[in-house]
């Protein structure tokens, strides 16, 4: 029986996606508020830097693990302000999270040029060579088979298409590392209990972050999936990193 990690627990590979779905379904309505509280607002700055990696908004963009739509809606607003002809597809395996994204898109009057697709990052329902950009923010670590998801990203991107991933990473500096670990394992689950009523969901969150490969390990995984010009940029001392690569 193939096993994988669900946080620090070992589970059957076939069960992980359902467990992850339950986590996000249970916190969907508090997801954005929790992001602000957990990161002390820093996630907004990280995401702003992330979308700067997309210079050409006259593009077909696939946002995978789109969640509540933060990345896609930032791009849609930026494109609208610049009168760009953007095409954005928001994909997530969790329908409850996509419902949150749709609500936000309607509230912000950004529904035009957006498509919503319930799909797994491991099996995307799109033809080869479909998109100019593939974005995924804080989602790849939740995928049961990360290598398979990376190969799918490579498949759906056009030649010279750009893969961009924002993910929690490994802090280098000792004093930041110690504080970050204490904050992650002791404070974040407590905030999750107080605000979302779900301590276990946020225990999974910090455990999944702790187990995610280092910047250099993930860079190798991206390269092995078929990408070229693979690199990364650390933000906030390595709390998160932006990974980027191109198809051939």
From Swiss-Prot:
Described function: Methyltransferase required for the conversion of demethylmenaquinol (DMKH2) to menaquinol (MKH2) and the conversion of 2-polyprenyl-6-methoxy-1,4-benzoquinol (DDMQH2) to 2-polyprenyl-3-methyl-6-methoxy-1,4-benzoquinol (DMQH2).
Top-level class of the enzyme under EC nomenclature: transferase
Any one biological process term the GO annotation gives: menaquinone biosynthetic process
Domain of life: Bacteria
Family of the protein in this entry: Belongs to the class I-like SAM-binding methyltransferase superfamily. MenG/UbiE family.
Species the sequence originates in: Rickettsia africae (strain ESF-5)
GO molecular function, one term: 2-methoxy-6-polyprenyl-1,4-benzoquinol methyltransferase activity
Record's protein name: Ubiquinone/menaquinone biosynthesis C-methyltransferase UbiE
Binding residue positions for S-adenosyl-L-methionine: 68, 92
Pathway(s) the chain acts in: Quinol/quinone metabolism; menaquinone biosynthesis; menaquinol from 1,4-dihydroxy-2-naphthoate: step 2/2; Cofactor biosynthesis; ubiquinone biosynthesis
Keyword set includes Methyltransferase: yes
Keyword Lyase (UniProt): no
Reaction(s) the record says it catalyses: a 2-demethylmenaquinol + S-adenosyl-L-methionine = a menaquinol + S-adenosyl-L-homocysteine + H(+); a 2-methoxy-6-(all-trans-polyprenyl)benzene-1,4-diol + S-adenosyl-L-methionine = a 5-methoxy-2-methyl-3-(all-trans-polyprenyl)benzene-1,4-diol + S-adenosyl-L-homocysteine + H(+)
Assigned EC number: 2.1.1.163, 2.1.1.201
Record key words, sorted: Menaquinone biosynthesis, Methyltransferase, S-adenosyl-L-methionine, Transferase, Ubiquinone biosynthesis
